[in-house]
Structures are given as structure tokens and as C-alpha cells.
Amino acid sequence: MLNRSKKRNGCYFWVNGSSDEIRYVAVKASPKVNWKTHIIWRSLKNVKCIDSFHGNNEILGAGSSTGNISLLSVKHPEFQAVVTPGYARPCNSLAFSETEHLVAGFAKSRNESSLKLWDLNSLLSDPKSSPLMQSSTLDGVSSVCYKKDTPLLLTGSTSRSVHIIDTRQQLDSVSSVNTQYYSNIVVDPFSPNYFAANSYDGDIAIFDTRYFKSDNYLQIILRNENKKPKNPQLFALKYSEWKPGQLAVLSNNSITLRQLLPCVNGNEGSANNSVFVNYEKKYPVKPNSQCSGIDFFTPSTAFPTHVQILGVINEQPKLFSVHDEVIPFSFNPYNDLIFSFKEKLYPLNSSPFNTLSDVPQFDVSEFVDENSFDSSSSCSSKVFLTTRNNSINSEDSAHEVLLSYNRVLGSDIQGTILDRVKKGYQFDSQKNSELVSDLYLKDLWSWIHLSHRQSEESLFGDTGDTDFSYQGALGIWFMDTELTSMSDVFEAKESKFLEKKILRLARDVIERLDLDIFTSIQTKRPLRQLALLACGLGMSNDDLLLEIRRLIRKNEHVKAAGLALFHGKIENVVRILSSGNELEKTISTAVAGYITSQGLSNFGSDSLWKEMSRNLSTELEDPYLRAIFAYVSNSDWRDVLDEVSLSLKDRLGIALRFLPDDDLSNYLCDLCHTTVQSGDPEGLLLTGLTPLGMELLQNYIDHTSDVQTAALIAAFVVPKKFLDKRAEDWTESYRELLNRWKLYRERAKFDIFRTELSKNHTGEITRKATEPSIRIICNFCRKPIFPFSNRNECNNLPTPIQRGVSKAGPAKHLGKSCPHCGQPLPKCSVCGFSLGDEDVPQKDDFSQKPQNYVKEVNLQKSRFGLWFSFCLNCGHGAHASHASEWFSTHTICPVPNCDCECKLK
């Protein structure tokens, strides 16, 4: 038996029946759950019930099977007063009131009342004091319990009834109900109108005292699933004082926790089934163990944030975790959140803006110095700079950011995807580069624009079975355009099988284009130049000078100086920096002084200047200044390549121009492994749009959930160059997302452009065009007016559909009647002519005529005015252009005697 102290001090009264003692204990939860005993009262045999009074001197009452009631003091443990009944019989239940009264319920006796009330102070001074009141009935009492903060007493009688007694009067029933649930009465501390009691076989009922005079007093019955009628049952009910509606039950060596919630009833007079079980969890006890008591436990009574169930298992304490019930919630396609708690629904809009397109995206520049990001575009450098320049000053500030649901939902990737779609984020790579705010995605789309233009213009020429289009530096340098994994990279690194052939092809491309691309290392120079060209780094000297001048005009002198350094124009670095601001002029003086004093051939000598330059390379924030001083300090390009704040594109250009062959191969392998694993999308400049690039994109999705960008990028090469199941999954996920948002037009454009991109170098479309989802069928023969590419589709058609808008392709001559049954086609309600003629578009099989694809699409757009259109309300039809012209000035249907009003006006 276990009861928590009413003083809320974390202590418990524990009846140890095997030792005939009662202990006043606390629970020591760490490092191991154990008792911490404060007081022990011994020689208390056959204790059947206990209760405590929470006054200044906490008093414990213990009733025994002989009827004796022992009064024990926590403040004075040596004190003990024993109240002896006139006739020996079990004391079944005790209850202390707020007004210092003690009520005891006894088993039935022929000669003495079974319900007695004493004044507590009188008993403490004289245990033989007579009761203030006693019941006139002689029925046995199984359970007694006071309603919180009231003089009303609830009693359960062995005559199978529950009574409400006003203790300000005689102990006679004010109201009562006949029920089999009369044992172990406990009152809900949060809702005193509710109380729980159990029957002999262990079923539990929840009562509402407000309906005792009606037939609706029973709220819910909780059946006991562990009934063992032949075995004696140890039963206990405990309400939690920390969370409303939590009821713990001990029955047949099994512990059950239920979360009870009240229903909302429109009619207050009807209370049937007004309580329901929202959550239930069972805590089984091992068969060879015995649980002798339960109660609720929390490590801190002042801040009860973590409530547990305390059970006495084999006389030792054991804690059972109490997990809150799962709160149902759901997101809609627009990232709004709604959740339910109890009987209410709580919607949370993702932002206070009208649309997600108005949501300001999460701006990393609030936390990172702006100059660092202006000159750095790699994903890895962003992470580095964020962690380097920022730290959370306090847990409170971090907590506030995490709890701002507007910001969390508004900057969620789903909101970002929706915002991009509305702005036209599709297959125009140049436009995509302008739409995205992330600098590394800007560079990525710029490279895809370059690669797509090179592929469309056949810039690399006819190279036979070797295709350099959409290739990155890795595939070109290792002379393997079909890299699928890192193992292929390592194999290609050692292979020399196609070296002569690829070098010859690369030399032919460079000579044909007449390009003068700078590389400091002359070995495999055509291959280096081709890799630089494919990565968008193939600037000639004239292009380099133009780019440097453009940067100087934009006052980006440091970036211009870095660009000159990366192209071997070391003498121009000082001149460019000297034309900048005061700080840049000072830095140019330092660089010039070192170059003048040491000379280019002595960069590696130890000197004070070298040490200062090395320190500056780690302390400066601008990545280009860091790179300049990293090179000046040691004249070693490896130090510059270790500068992670530089964009991957810049580091790749340095490696291709200045590293020897073996060092370049090793560096590209290491860089590839890092970028693929991290999912850095700028790494596609290295891997290209290859199966290995698809692996990088998969890791990018795993890190960002940006399936939109991955699906768009993959469409440039899948299925035109190779098949990839991952890319197909991304595409279908993105299409499904657009459909959920009901952006059917954008999804249709996505499908159309994907089909156009799937055209290979021979003009063949490798992707099957998406079938239209709307058909116009004849209302008489139920066959499609426009022929299908697959004639068998005509056999399984739905019921006649006459309302809708057809978007079929260009048609052959149809005339004014159905091509199948000859019935006349509907007439235009504006012009009166038939809706079918030779200009009405129908579906055609473009996969058979790929060379006419763009021409036919443009033809469809020009003929849109002659397409079928029908009112969804009245069913009258018209040519699309005629309907548009009519309803631009009218609101009523043009058919006489039809009063259908346009819903869009």
C-alpha cells in the first residue's frame, strides 16, 4: 500500500505488510531508484487502509483488520494514539477533511454503526473520545472519500450503493445511487464532480455527482481485462494531481494508465458518455514479482514537468515512464499546420502573409558577415563561415528561434518550393539562376545553362562514342564519361586505356574552337583546357581582362585581384588592389613589398614577412585576400586549395591550371569524395550530370529535401543520356507535390518541357509524352471525337462527357459530324457554326515526328481560339475565342432563354 504525503514534499507513506511496519520514505531516483527512509513505525499488523492530514503536524491514520485506528505523527514519530471500536471488525477506509475531522468506514455490524466521524484534535488528546456523528444505518462501508474543499462525503456501501453525505448535518445520505461500483472511491482533484470507483471484479466506473438524481450519473465504464475471479485481487485507484484526467489503476499485478477527457455536449442535461479514454498504456509486472502499491511521482513537486508512476515491486520502488498522448496533427499542401487537443482544433498558419510567396526566406547573411558570402559560393564554405563567425550567446535566444513557428514553417523547404514555382522556376536555367537566393545554386544553374548551350550548339563536335556534353572536370580528366560511383573514379584514375584517344579528341575540340585557355602545367594541356571549358572556366586572355574590368567597375577589387592571381597574372594583383579603397591599397603595398624584396623565385624562404603573410591568410575574412596571402606566404598552390572559404569553382580552376598530373588526380578524387558525401550541389561541376552526379543529388535531397531542384536538373540528362531510378522517383514526387497544390498548369508545363529535353542528338524523343487527362467523346456513340494513338483505348470509355475543355493536339479533317457515327457535332452558341472543322486540334503522336515537335506546339497555341469549350453549368458550347470575347462584355449565356450566369465574372 502506498500513499503520497499531502504536504507535497515528495514523501510517501508505504505500508510494508511483510514486516508489519509503515515507513515515511522519499524516492532516490539516481543513480539507482531506491528508498530513502525518514521514519519507521513498527508493530502495526494487518493494516487495511491509510490516509493523512496535511496540517502543520502531518498526521497519518492507519486502519487495521481488527478495527483499530492508529494515529501517527510525522513531526513526533514516537507519538501514537489508537482508536478502538466497540466491536472488532475490519476498518475498510479512512478520510481526513479540511476541517480536521476523521471519518472511518467499517464492515457491517449488527450492534454498531459502520460510519463514524470524530474530531481529530479530540482523538489526539483522548483516543477514547466519542464520535461527533455516526450513521444510523448498519450497512457495511467499503470506501469513504471527501470531495475536495467541500464538506460532502462520498461513501460506498457493501449493500451495492454509493451515497453523498453532507457532514454538516447528521451522517445521513443526501442522495444515493444503486451500483456495483462502490469500492476504492477516489475524486478527480481537477474536476471534483467526477469520481472513480471499482466493482468486485475490477471494472471501473466514472461518476458525475451532478447527475445523481437522474439516470445519467455513470459517465464511462472501463472494463478490467485481467479478471481473475478465483484469486484475491489487490486493487488501487490513483488520480494524478499534476495532469488532469490521468488515472492509474493497479489490478491483478498489472498497472494501467488512462488519460480521461470530457466530451463537449451541447445539451448539459444529457451527460451519458461525456467522458472518453484519450490514451491508455499498460505496464505489466513480471509473474514472479508482486506489486503492492502505486502512486504518481515527480522529481520536482514545484516544477512537475516529468511525471512518472511509482510502483512498489517486491518491496522495492520502481519508476514507470508516463509519456503524453500523441497529439494528432496534419499539414496541408501549403504548409499550414492544424492539431487537435481535447475537443478543440488549433490551426497554425505558416505565416501572417497572404501567400507563401510573401514570406521572407531565411537570410543567413543576418548571422554571417556579408562580404564573406559575396565572395564565396560553395555550400561547404557557408557552413564553415556560419560556425566560424557565430555562436549562440544564450540558450534563451536559441529557444526563441526554435519556438517561432512562423519562421520555421515560413522558411520550410516546401514553402520555398512553392514560392519558386509561382515565380517560374522551371527549365530556363538562366532565369533559375536569377530566382534562387543561394549563391551556390546560382553558380550551379549558370553552369547548367552553359552546359545546355554547349550541348545544343554541339560545341564539342561529333566525338563518336565519347560524349563530353554535361560532363564535369572529373569525367574529362579521368577520360571516363560514364562514372557511376567512387569505385569507378578510382579505377579510371589508374586506367590509361583511352588516354591517347581522349587526348586527341580534346585537342581537336580546342583547335577547332581556337581557344587560348591559360594553364601553367603543360602536360595533358588539351585535357586541362577541355575540363576548364566544360566547367565554365575557359576564359581567354581577352575575356579575363574584360571580366577583371567589370569587377573593378563594381568596386570588387579584391575579387578581381584573386581572379588575376588564379590565372597566373601575379603582376596584376598589386595594380588591381592599389586602385581600390584605403585598406586594399595598404594590402597592395604589403604584397608589392614582399614581391620586390624576395622575388618570385624566393617565395619559399623563411622570413618575418612570410610569417606575417601566413598569419594574415588565416585572420582575414575575405576569402580572396586569404587566398592571396596564402600563396604569397609560400608560393604553394596547395595552401590556396586548402582555403575552404573559396568557392569550389575557384579551387577547381586553380587545381586544373597549376597542379601536376598526379597531384591533380589525387586532389580531384578527394574533392569528389567530399562533395558527393556532403551533397554539395556545386560539386556537379566536378562530377557532371552523370550517374555519380545523381548520387550527389540524392545526398543533397537527404540534407535539404529540395526535390524540386534535383528533379529539374535530372531532366536534362534522364532519360536522354542514361536511365536512373532515383531521378524518376524525384520527378514523380515533384509532380505529385504540384498536383497536391492544384498547380496543374505548372505540372503540365513541367511534363511538356521534360519531353522536349529528352530529344537526343539524332532528334529522337526518348521520353514518352504524358497522355492528356481530358477527352471529348461523342454523346451518341460514346467514342472519342479525336482518334487515339492506341485504338484499343476506344473500347474502355467512361460515360458521355460533354462539359469541359479539350486540350487535344492538331487534328485531321473532321467536318461537322462525329467521324464514327456521323451525328452532327454541337454548334458554337455565339457564331452558330459547328465546333468541328479542319482546324480543330487533335492529339498526334509526336514521338513519330520529333522534328516537327516545336512547330506543332506553336501551331496548337495559334489555334487555341478554335478549341472546344463548354460551360460546366448549362453545358452550352462555343469556340474558345468566341466564348472569351462574349463573356468579356456579358455575364449571361449567349443561348436564348438560358439565364445561366458566368461564375467567373
UniProtKB/Swiss-Prot annotation:
InterPro entries: MIOS/Sea4, MIOS_a-sol, WD40/YVTN_repeat-like_dom_sf, WD40_repeat_dom_sf, WD40_rpt, Zn_ribbon_mio
Gene3D superfamilies to which the protein is assigned, alphabetical: YVTN repeat-like/Quinoprotein amine dehydrogenase
UniProt keyword list: Phosphoprotein, Repeat, WD repeat
Ubl conjugation listed as a keyword: no
Domain of life: Eukaryota
PTM sites of type Phosphoserine: 394, 397
Coiled-coil annotated spans: none
GO molecular function: ubiquitin protein ligase activity; zinc ion binding
Signal peptide start and end residues: none
Intervals holding WD repeats: 42-82, 86-128, 136-175, 177-217
Keyword Phosphoprotein: yes
GO CC annotations on file: cytoplasm; cytosol; GATOR2 complex; vacuolar membrane
GO BP terms: positive regulation of TORC1 signaling
Pfam families to which the protein is assigned, alphabetical: MIOS_a-sol (PF21719), zinc_ribbon_16 (PF17034)
Family, similarity comment: Belongs to the WD repeat mio family.
Protein name per UniProt: Uncharacterized WD repeat-containing protein C12G12.01c
Species this chain originates from: Schizosaccharomyces pombe (strain 972 / ATCC 24843) (Fission yeast)
